[in-house]
């Protein structure tokens, strides 16, 4: 039912889903209901919860810079929060595929918009992970672990920035 409600699939487009407050709200309520039910019925047998989302339930995607109305809106809000002025829309998918230095490294002098876009992309996914961990922790006792499959930074070079895991230090530092 959830995939029919939105114009994207959170399995393959987690950054788009994570950019959507409605998706976050609905999914959070579903998770909280699931945890409450599980704790009530099986709580004494459960020692950990794994929070999963995105590609293969590991919070990644290979979107290569595709955008959407909802992600453009989130980009503008992110830029505003970070006092960055880089335009109304995210950089085009085709421009993100080109880098000044041997087509591998962006030039901060001329391609800062691309660097900041990928920072936004990775942060929006990490923020979703942390959001769900915090909401889950409120319902789960401290003696139970909460985990995620996240933080793969040794993936193929042409997919690394769009993979969504480059804000792993933020996630790993979480107390939740």
What positions do the PLM features span?
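Polysaccharide-binding and catalytic clefts of secreted carbohydrate-active enzymes
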Residues: 2-175
